[in-house]
Amino acid sequence: AGKTTFFDLISGFQDSDDGKVILNNKNITKSQSYTIARLGMVRTFQLTKVFDRMTVLENMMFSASKVDNDSFIKSLVKPPSQKNKEIDIKEKSFEIMKNLNIGHMANSYARELSGGQKKLLELGRSIINDPEILLLDEPLAGVNPKLAEEILEIILNLSKNGISILMVEHNIEAVMKISERVIVFAEVKVIADDI
Protein backbone atom coordinates (compact mmCIF):
# COMPACT_ATOMS: atom_id res chain seq x y z
CA ALA A 1 0.00 0.00 0.00
CA GLY A 2 3.04 2.30 0.23
CA LYS A 3 3.20 2.82 4.00
CA THR A 4 6.81 1.74 4.51
CA THR A 5 7.83 3.54 1.32
CA PHE A 6 6.24 6.68 2.77
CA PHE A 7 8.41 6.28 5.89
CA ASP A 8 11.48 5.59 3.72
CA LEU A 9 10.85 8.80 1.76
CA ILE A 10 10.33 11.13 4.70
CA SER A 11 13.19 9.67 6.76
CA GLY A 12 15.83 9.80 4.03
CA PHE A 13 16.14 6.09 3.32
CA GLN A 14 14.80 6.49 -0.22
CA ASP A 15 14.85 9.37 -2.72
CA SER A 16 11.57 10.66 -4.07
CA ASP A 17 10.78 11.19 -7.73
CA ASP A 18 8.54 14.15 -6.99
CA GLY A 19 7.38 16.37 -4.14
CA LYS A 20 9.08 17.78 -1.06
CA VAL A 21 9.58 16.75 2.53
CA ILE A 22 9.53 19.70 4.94
CA LEU A 23 10.59 19.35 8.59
CA ASN A 24 10.41 22.42 10.84
CA ASN A 25 10.28 24.72 7.79
CA LYS A 26 13.40 23.07 6.30
CA ASN A 27 13.38 21.18 3.01
CA ILE A 28 14.88 17.76 3.81
CA THR A 29 13.84 16.06 0.58
CA LYS A 30 17.36 15.04 -0.50
CA SER A 31 18.84 14.79 3.01
CA GLN A 32 20.56 11.66 4.27
CA SER A 33 18.86 9.65 7.02
CA TYR A 34 21.51 10.54 9.62
CA THR A 35 20.99 14.25 8.90
CA ILE A 36 17.25 13.86 9.35
CA ALA A 37 17.85 11.97 12.62
CA ARG A 38 20.00 14.86 13.87
CA LEU A 39 17.12 17.20 13.03
CA GLY A 40 14.88 15.18 15.36
CA MET A 41 13.04 12.62 13.21
CA VAL A 42 13.96 8.97 13.76
CA ARG A 43 12.36 5.68 12.84
CA THR A 44 12.09 2.03 13.65
CA PHE A 45 11.78 -0.73 11.08
CA GLN A 46 9.26 -3.48 10.50
CA LEU A 47 12.12 -5.97 10.60
CA THR A 48 14.27 -5.01 13.58
CA LYS A 49 17.78 -3.80 12.90
CA VAL A 50 19.89 -4.47 15.97
CA PHE A 51 23.58 -5.33 16.23
CA ASP A 52 23.43 -9.01 17.15
CA ARG A 53 27.10 -9.24 18.19
CA MET A 54 26.83 -6.33 20.60
CA THR A 55 25.19 -6.35 24.01
CA VAL A 56 21.88 -4.63 24.57
CA LEU A 57 23.71 -1.83 26.41
CA GLU A 58 26.27 -1.46 23.60
CA ASN A 59 23.41 -1.23 21.08
CA MET A 60 21.88 1.61 23.08
CA MET A 61 25.16 3.48 23.55
CA PHE A 62 26.15 3.05 19.92
CA SER A 63 22.87 4.61 18.82
CA ALA A 64 23.43 7.60 21.09
CA SER A 65 26.94 8.07 19.75
CA LYS A 66 26.02 7.89 16.08
CA VAL A 67 23.81 10.97 16.14
CA ASP A 68 26.77 13.00 17.42
CA ASN A 69 28.56 12.17 14.14
CA ASP A 70 31.17 10.02 15.83
CA SER A 71 33.05 7.55 13.69
CA PHE A 72 32.29 3.86 14.15
CA ILE A 73 35.52 3.29 16.10
CA LYS A 74 35.05 6.38 18.30
CA SER A 75 31.53 5.30 19.15
CA LEU A 76 32.89 2.01 20.50
CA VAL A 77 36.07 3.30 22.22
CA LYS A 78 35.78 6.78 23.70
CA PRO A 79 38.88 8.87 24.46
CA PRO A 80 39.33 9.89 28.12
CA SER A 81 38.14 13.44 27.37
CA GLN A 82 34.68 12.08 26.66
CA LYS A 83 34.39 9.93 29.77
CA ASN A 84 31.66 12.10 31.35
CA LYS A 85 29.63 12.04 28.15
CA GLU A 86 29.95 8.25 28.05
CA ILE A 87 28.78 7.98 31.66
CA ASP A 88 25.76 10.17 30.87
CA ILE A 89 24.91 8.03 27.83
CA LYS A 90 25.29 4.86 29.87
CA GLU A 91 23.01 6.15 32.62
CA LYS A 92 20.41 7.27 30.09
CA SER A 93 20.66 3.88 28.35
CA PHE A 94 20.01 2.06 31.62
CA GLU A 95 17.06 4.33 32.40
CA ILE A 96 15.47 3.69 29.00
CA MET A 97 16.13 -0.06 29.16
CA LYS A 98 14.56 -0.18 32.63
CA ASN A 99 11.47 1.68 31.38
CA LEU A 100 11.20 -0.77 28.48
CA ASN A 101 11.57 -3.81 30.78
CA ILE A 102 14.83 -4.95 29.17
CA GLY A 103 17.22 -3.51 31.77
CA HIS A 104 17.93 -6.97 33.15
CA MET A 105 19.28 -7.92 29.71
CA ALA A 106 21.81 -5.07 29.44
CA ASN A 107 24.79 -7.43 29.24
CA SER A 108 23.09 -10.01 27.01
CA TYR A 109 23.94 -10.10 23.35
CA ALA A 110 21.18 -8.73 21.14
CA ARG A 111 21.09 -12.05 19.26
CA GLU A 112 19.83 -13.68 22.49
CA LEU A 113 16.70 -11.51 22.61
CA SER A 114 13.29 -12.68 21.49
CA GLY A 115 11.65 -10.90 18.57
CA GLY A 116 9.55 -8.81 20.95
CA GLN A 117 12.57 -7.87 23.05
CA LYS A 118 14.37 -6.79 19.87
CA LYS A 119 11.39 -4.54 19.09
CA LEU A 120 11.81 -2.96 22.54
CA LEU A 121 15.55 -2.54 22.00
CA GLU A 122 14.97 -0.87 18.64
CA LEU A 123 12.39 1.42 20.24
CA GLY A 124 14.90 2.28 22.98
CA ARG A 125 17.60 3.01 20.43
CA SER A 126 15.22 5.30 18.57
CA ILE A 127 14.38 7.42 21.62
CA ILE A 128 17.82 7.72 23.24
CA ASN A 129 18.52 10.93 21.33
CA ASP A 130 15.23 12.59 22.35
CA PRO A 131 13.55 12.81 18.93
CA GLU A 132 10.76 15.26 18.19
CA ILE A 133 9.17 12.88 15.68
CA LEU A 134 9.19 9.09 15.89
CA LEU A 135 8.22 6.91 12.93
CA LEU A 136 7.16 3.43 14.07
CA ASP A 137 6.91 0.81 11.32
CA GLU A 138 4.66 -1.98 12.58
CA PRO A 139 5.80 -1.91 16.21
CA LEU A 140 3.32 -4.67 17.17
CA ALA A 141 4.10 -7.08 14.33
CA GLY A 142 5.08 -10.51 15.60
CA VAL A 143 4.73 -9.75 19.30
CA ASN A 144 2.43 -11.52 21.74
CA PRO A 145 -0.71 -9.74 23.00
CA LYS A 146 0.78 -8.98 26.44
CA LEU A 147 3.85 -7.33 24.94
CA ALA A 148 1.68 -5.52 22.39
CA GLU A 149 -0.21 -3.90 25.29
CA GLU A 150 3.09 -2.90 26.92
CA ILE A 151 4.35 -1.37 23.67
CA LEU A 152 1.10 0.56 23.23
CA GLU A 153 1.46 1.95 26.75
CA ILE A 154 5.05 2.98 25.99
CA ILE A 155 3.93 4.70 22.78
CA LEU A 156 1.21 6.58 24.67
CA ASN A 157 3.73 7.73 27.27
CA LEU A 158 6.14 8.92 24.58
CA SER A 159 3.32 10.91 23.01
CA LYS A 160 2.34 12.40 26.38
CA ASN A 161 5.98 13.47 26.80
CA GLY A 162 5.85 15.55 23.63
CA ILE A 163 7.09 13.18 20.93
CA SER A 164 5.00 13.28 17.76
CA ILE A 165 4.44 9.72 16.56
CA LEU A 166 3.56 8.42 13.12
CA MET A 167 2.83 4.71 13.16
CA VAL A 168 2.28 2.12 10.45
CA GLU A 169 0.28 -0.74 11.94
CA HIS A 170 -2.14 -3.42 10.73
CA ASN A 171 -3.72 -3.96 14.15
CA ILE A 172 -6.67 -1.59 13.68
CA GLU A 173 -7.95 -2.07 17.23
CA ALA A 174 -4.59 -0.99 18.63
CA VAL A 175 -4.38 1.94 16.23
CA MET A 176 -7.82 3.23 17.23
CA LYS A 177 -6.98 2.79 20.91
CA ILE A 178 -4.00 5.17 20.94
CA SER A 179 -4.27 7.44 17.90
CA GLU A 180 -5.45 11.03 17.71
CA ARG A 181 -5.65 10.84 13.92
CA VAL A 182 -5.80 7.84 11.57
CA ILE A 183 -4.97 7.91 7.86
CA VAL A 184 -5.66 4.77 5.81
CA PHE A 185 -3.50 3.93 2.77
CA ALA A 186 -4.40 1.45 0.02
CA GLU A 187 -2.64 0.99 -3.30
CA VAL A 188 -0.38 4.01 -2.64
CA LYS A 189 -3.38 6.30 -2.07
CA VAL A 190 -4.97 7.82 0.99
CA ILE A 191 -8.47 6.34 1.14
CA ALA A 192 -9.50 7.71 4.54
CA ASP A 193 -8.24 10.52 6.72
CA ASP A 194 -8.97 11.59 10.29
CA ILE A 195 -11.18 8.64 11.17
Where are the regions a protein language model picked out?
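Conserved ABC ATPase signature
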Residues: 109-113
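Helix-to-loop junction immediately C-terminal to a conserved catalytic motif
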Residues: 11
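Conserved ABC transporter NBD signature motif
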Residues: 19-26, 38-39, 192
